[in-house]
Amino acid sequence: MITILFAVPSLWAEYESALPEALDEAGIDATLVTEADPADVDYIVYAPASPLQDFTPYTRAKAVLNLWAGVERIVGNQTLTQPLTRMVDPGLTEGMVEWVVGHTLRHHLGMDRHIVNPGHVWDPTCPPLARER
């Protein structure tokens, strides 16, 4: 049987019922635990908030499954020798696209003239159209 260590206690309540259901739907026979002997762990579900930072004892682990799309907080961890996967989800992608578009428009439209305006003075300057930039 596969043993999956959910190594993010602060997020367990959010995943406690959803992960077993998803494993069942995928036909994966696995035991999902929040504590385990490192020698028994096949996969680690991880997020940067996890107290688990030393992966050295997890010699049997086949992969670390990161709940976040970003991996910048873990890639420098010298104890991580297992393959690292990151979350890929349409909602994460959509949210990141919206965030990038929003900040790009903020920059190109010069919105900080209005947002960061301690004198509360109206600036009637029209930004150029995109094709004119």
Model feature map: region roles:
Residues W12, R60, P127-R131:
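A generic alpha-helix propensity feature with a strong bias for hydrophobic helices
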Residues M1-D42:
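N-terminal glycine-/charge-rich "phosphate-binding" loop or analogous flexible N-terminal tail
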Residues L32, T79-T81, C126-P127:
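A short alpha-helix capping/helix-coil boundary motif
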